[in-house]
Amino acid sequence: RQYHVSYSFFGNGSNLLVGDKGIRGVVIEMTDPMGNIEVDGTKITAQAGAMLSKIANTAASNGLGGMEFAAGIPGSVGGAVVMNAGAYGREMKDIIEKVYVLDENGAQLELDRDALDLGYRHSCIPEKKYIVTKVVLELVPRNEAEIRSEMKELNEKRAEKQPLQYPSAGSTFKRPEGYFAGKLIMDAGLRGYQVGGAQVSEKHCGFVINKGDATAADICQLMRDVSDKVQAQFGVVLEPEVKMIGEF
């Protein structure tokens, strides 16, 4: 800030699409240097860069349930809080007790769950330009074998239904109220639709995959085409879940 250089903070980058021209300014990765996890009773305190899978496994080893849904999400806990990540009917807001952030002036703030304005794939963190540094999760006692059994079941379901063999930025569009994005895309006849190296997954139409040589421009064009065709056929507006950053 002293030198007026723009900066961006990344976790694992799981739900991001970076423009083909890259990101102007400094990019700060939060994963390796900020991945500490501590357990205290039923609470887990994790630095923002800690991976969800690692936290879920730590919770299981300590007989703490509540993180099962997140075990297969390939992201950091900081990023998961920012977008209120979720799967299989559960969301981060179900287990967050409080979050520590830095504001634009570098002051540390402690925010409880209600102060985060958590909704479907939403929090107030981006609009307030906060940087998540640490998260406190409140979990519940549960038998470790039951936890691991559920985690295994959910991961198998994920592998069965999602195109994990191809690179993607995860679920491409948010779920419109009363609909499922993937089904709308499929019903619009767009299964397998391709622009350059980007393709609507034939396995799950809610995912846009990289077949090997896709550019960010390919993916953006495909997303526009899909959104336009779904709106034209069904009158439903698809809102991107993928966050686009950098220069396109």
Regions found by a protein language model. Give the residues of each.
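Residues embedded in well-ordered beta-strands within globular domains across many folds
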Residues: 38, 68, 100, 242-243
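Hydrophobic, well-ordered secondary-structure segments
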Residues: 52, 56, 70, 74, ...
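Structural signature of FAD isoalloxazine-binding scaffolds in flavoprotein oxidoreductases
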Residues: 17-35, 82-113, 127-134
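Short, basic and Ser/Thr-rich N-terminal targeting/leader segments
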Residues: 3, 10-12, 95, 166-167, ...
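Phosphate/pyrophosphate- and phosphate-bearing ligand-binding catalytic cores of soluble enzymes
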Residues: 16, 102-229, 233-248
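A generic local secondary-structure boundary/capping motif
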Residues: 16, 56-59, 67-71, 84-91, ...
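Anion-binding (especially nucleotide phosphate/pyrophosphate-binding) glycine-rich loop
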Residues: 1-77
